[in-house]
C-alpha cells in the first residue's frame, strides 16, 4: 500500500491544470472515460475537481458591474451612489438609473467590482457582476 500512498501524495501536489492533464493521459493510456465513472460517496468533490478542463481553471480578471433593478422607493439613494461612482451629472444619472439594466463600470478588477456592487446593494438596488 506504500506505493499507492506515495502516488496519492504526489497527486495532491498537482495544480488543477496538471491534474486535468493527468486525467486525460489516464483516459488515453487505459482507454477509459472518467466522466462515465460514478464517484464513491464522499469522494465526489475530489473527483470533480480533477475532471475540470483548463478553461474552467482560468480566473476572470476583468468584470462588468451591471445595475439590474432600482426600486422606486430607493431611487434617490441609488442615484447618489451612481453619481459618486460614475461622475455623471444629476440629469444624466437620473436617466441612467431610469433605464436599467445598464453597465455602471466595465472591465474593472474583481475587488473594485465587489466594492461597487456592495455600495449599490447597500443603497437598495440589484446588481450583477459579469
From Swiss-Prot:
GO terms for cellular component: chloroplast; cytosolic large ribosomal subunit. One of its GO terms (biological process) is translation. Its main location: plastid. The keyword Plastid applies. CDD domains: Ribosomal_L7_L12. It is found in: Plastid, Chloroplast. It holds the Pfam family Ribosomal_L12_N. It comes from the Eukaryota. One of its GO terms (molecular function) is structural constituent of ribosome. Keywords: Chloroplast, Plastid, Ribonucleoprotein, Ribosomal protein. Forms part of the ribosomal stalk which helps the ribosome interact with GTP-bound translation factors. Is thus essential for accurate translation. Homodimer. Part of the ribosomal stalk of the 50S ribosomal subunit. Forms a multimeric L10(L12)X complex, where L10 forms an elongated spine to which 2 to 4 L12 dimers bind in a sequential fashion. Binds GTP-bound translation factors. NCBIfam families: L12. Belongs to the bacterial ribosomal protein bL12 family. This is Large ribosomal subunit protein bL12c. It comes from Cyanidium caldarium (Red alga).
Amino acid at each position: 500500500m506504500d506505493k499507492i500512498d506515495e502516488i496519492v501524495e504526489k497527486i495532491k501536489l498537482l495544480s488543477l491544470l496538471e491534474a486535468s492533464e493527468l486525467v486525460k493521459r489516464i483516459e488515453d493510456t487505459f482507454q477509459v472515460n472518467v466522466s462515465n465513472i460514478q464517484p464513491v460517496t464522499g469522494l465526489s468533490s475530489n473527483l470533480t475537481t480533477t475532471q475540470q478542463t483548463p478553461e474552467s481553471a482560468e480566473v476572470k480578471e476583468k468584470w462588468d458591474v451591471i445595475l439590474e433593478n432600482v426600486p422606486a422607493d430607493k431611487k434617490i439613494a441609488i442615484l447618489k451612489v451612481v453619481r459618486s461612482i460614475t461622475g455623471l451629472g444629476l440629469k444624466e444619472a437620473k436617466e441612467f438609473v431610469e433605464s436599467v439594466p445598464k453597465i455602471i463600470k466595465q472591465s474593472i478588477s474583481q475587488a473594485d467590482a465587489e466594492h461597487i456592487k456592495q455600495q449599490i446593494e447597500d443603497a437598495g438596488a440589484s446588481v450583477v457582476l459579469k
